[in-house]
């Protein structure tokens, strides 16, 4: 989406540093519930993905960003079940020289190319059940208004000036590079040619007069912000990386290009000879979505959580907060950063023909299955590897066998012929192990299960707060295994409903297992929404009983009435998740060629 830029400044910087910083102020928030400030008067929260550049079709990295944001947003809604209080935006970044050139090469107007590729992202996100409340396109009129107003704020505060920049420019990446980011590699003729150290694309020496943002004035305010809030950027290694970057001087930053060179973008207000640089234009999308420049945006900002890939960290953790401070606003509440996906140990690349088509994967592994795989296997702190066999093994083991098998066992007509939530017998399973009497049949492992599932919602919430969704799913999977062990240990299929000795314990075993399943279904809603809906519907859990506030696990065990005891189960919903290895004939590489 965004590309790193840096220049050697030749123009005058002008205004005094002290006078520029006097107006900057900070509001700090602690690591309370995800996306919610300590001082907020309501539960309003705003989640964003990056906006995706329309120079190529979507791949699984794009989908992964969207799924992380979707899961965080859905989990927040479980905590505060009000869609009106939660915003979630995604979209496409549609300006810039690469779009201008790609459209010309394809014989299309830039707007036609943007329409075509943006539609692909929108279709993918619909198919993947991404619950965004807004899809922003930077070619929209509302965005142009927001960007030009933001520009005016920076200019009115003395933070923009015209100057001559000279430096290496990479046309493919649409960015300027410092000398340290340029290397030499043999070209087609064998001569050493300058290329970008990060992308390998050719660079050329360029000199150009542009508008310049006084980024150099913001090094100390940014350090103050990050040192005052250790969780502002999560995971911690990325927070540390940004602080390391800030140990070096920040050069002022080009924020426009000559319109004769770049016409596909938003003009600088009052100067049609310049076009606002695409990366500044793109960042302002986060404000556009919440109504900027109208006053309504203040009810959302800065209560905002950005979910981004590590390749655009500098834009979101240095340039964007500095621009916001310059415009008189606070930095976002949280910046959640994730790493990338490789394919069979290699970086995804068109030249290697190994770019994974996410729509093929959604079709092959089901929407819920592929969502679960990416969020279960993706670890934000480091790159993760994809291959088809790994998907099949994980989904068959955890969704088809463990979770689906558990639901099938506990609702099967042979074991639960009445089709109800059976009664819990407190004498069979007393609340304290020491209270076990002649009728008590619960074992130490059973109490460990109850304890694990009772604490699971808090554990999962903590993992979400720490941007460790994979750990949340690992914790759920562990409890599913424990519950299967509980059922296997007590073998309800060997007990007899007609026996006055067996019946109370048989009902209790099923009641405990169904209560565990209800917790699992509730906690899986952010990750596998359709599967979780089928599971909860099979248990007879209504739509108003699916928030975290309504969970109340195993009330009867704690001496309270249960609204589920004696309730009829919901209608049969079929196999919860079909095994994938039973249809291996279709297991081919889901890659574009």
From Swiss-Prot:
The gene is MARS2. Its EC number is 6.1.1.10. It holds the Pfam family Anticodon_3. Keywords: Aminoacyl-tRNA synthetase, ATP-binding, Ligase, Mitochondrion, Nucleotide-binding, Protein biosynthesis, Transit peptide. This is Methionine--tRNA ligase, mitochondrial. SUPFAM superfamilies: Anticodon-binding domain of a subclass of class I aminoacyl-tRNA synthetases, Nucleotidylyl transferase. The keyword Transferase does not apply. Gene3D superfamilies: 2.170.220.10, HUPs, Isoleucyl-tRNA Synthetase, Domain 1. It comes from Bos taurus (Bovine). One of its GO terms (molecular function) is methionine-tRNA ligase activity. It catalyses: tRNA(Met) + L-methionine + ATP = L-methionyl-tRNA(Met) + AMP + diphosphate.
